[in-house]
């Protein structure tokens, strides 16, 4: 990477992010603007993918809400996310868990690792 770009992005990288991988269940505290108010919205689900590197790294979180699957993509280093909590660690053998989209109920469960 260009040293100039690298030096500019280094100051914007966050250091308060816990280590998590696909298969882990996370609770993301995202800032949402509604009109002139700003509030924190909690989005809890399974990390099904991590993409990119450096400042442009993203992760996808999937949850089931009222029987409908909902996925949100969050940039890791965004100031819009106040904090990320790892609720439980999952044991999976894939980096991308897109196959969970086709599974329902108990079939979509992920085995837990004790850490």
UniProtKB/Swiss-Prot annotation:
UniProt-listed InterPro entries = Ribosomal_bL19, Ribosomal_bL19_CS, Ribosomal_bL19_sf, Translation_prot_SH3-like_sf
Q: GO molecular function terms here? A: structural constituent of ribosome
Q: Which SUPFAM superfamilies match?
A: Translation proteins SH3-like domain
Its cellular-component GO annotations read: cytosolic large ribosomal subunit
Q: Where is the signal peptide?
A: none
Q: Which HAMAP family match?
A: Ribosomal_bL19
The protein's role, per its UniProt record: This protein is located at the 30S-50S ribosomal subunit interface and may play a role in the structure and function of the aminoacyl-tRNA binding site.
Sequence similarity: Belongs to the bacterial ribosomal protein bL19 family.
Protein name per UniProt: Large ribosomal subunit protein bL19
Tell me which species this is from. Answer: Streptococcus pneumoniae serotype 4 (strain ATCC BAA-334 / TIGR4)
């Amino acid at each position: 990477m260009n040293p100039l770009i690298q030096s500019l992005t280094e100051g914007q990288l966050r250091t308060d992010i816990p280590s998590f991988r696909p298969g882990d269940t996370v609770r993301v505290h995202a800032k949402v603007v509604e009109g002139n108010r700003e509030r924190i919205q909690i989005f809890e689900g399974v990390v099904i993918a991590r993409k990119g590197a450096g400042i442009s790294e993203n992760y996808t979180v999937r949850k089931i809400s009222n029987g409908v699957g909902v996925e949100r993509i969050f940039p890791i280093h965004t100031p819009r996310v106040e904090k990320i909590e790892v609720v439980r660690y999952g044991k999976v053998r894939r980096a991308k868990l897109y196959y969970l989209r086709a599974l329902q109920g108990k079939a979509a469960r992920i085995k837990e690792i004790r850490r």
